[in-house]
Amino acid sequence: MKFSLATIALAAAVAASPTNPPAGAGNCNVKGKTGNVTCCNSAIPILGQLACNVLASGTCNSGQTAYCCDTGGNTGLINVIALNCVKLL
């Protein structure tokens, strides 16, 4: 039982560890405007793209995909920034 708990805890820690930063982490260009690099969970098709994290540390977590998002016009109560995003390669 203790071995199983230790193995699960180790697997969770490895899965949550950050990966290499995407090229040009921080600022990017969307349709001629300066945008921000965000990390979205690609494992959940729709909800994962709506719940994107603005890249502050320079790395995305394992299982996340880097997107360049235009955040210039998002001033409402609900910011749907995934609609203004372009996937980075």
Swiss-Prot record:
The keyword DNA repair does not apply. Residues 1-16 form the signal peptide. The keyword Disulfide bond applies. It comes from the Eukaryota. Keywords: Cell wall, Cytoplasmic vesicle, Disulfide bond, Glycoprotein, Secreted, Signal, Vacuole. Its main location: secreted. Glycans are attached at N36. Induction: Under normal conditions on SDAY medium (Sabouraud dextrose agar plus 1% yeast extract), hyd1C is consistently down-regulated. Hyd1A is the most active at transcription level under normal culture conditions, followed by hyd1B, hyd1E, hyd2A and hyd2C in order. Disulfide bonds join C28-C68, C39-C60, C40-C52, C69-C85. It is found in: Secreted; Secreted, Cell wall; Vacuole; Cytoplasmic vesicle. Disruption phenotype: Does not affect radial growth and multiple stress responses. Aerial growth, conidiation, and dispersal of filamentous fungi in the environment rely upon a capability of their secreting small amphipathic proteins called hydrophobins (HPBs) with low sequence identity. Class I can self-assemble into an outermost layer of rodlet bundles on aerial cell surfaces, conferring cellular hydrophobicity that supports fungal growth, development and dispersal; whereas Class II form highly ordered films at water-air interfaces through intermolecular interactions but contribute nothing to the rodlet structure. Belongs to the fungal hydrophobin family. This is Class I hydrophobin C. The lineage of its organism: Eukaryota, Fungi, Dikarya, Ascomycota, Pezizomycotina. The gene is hyd1C.
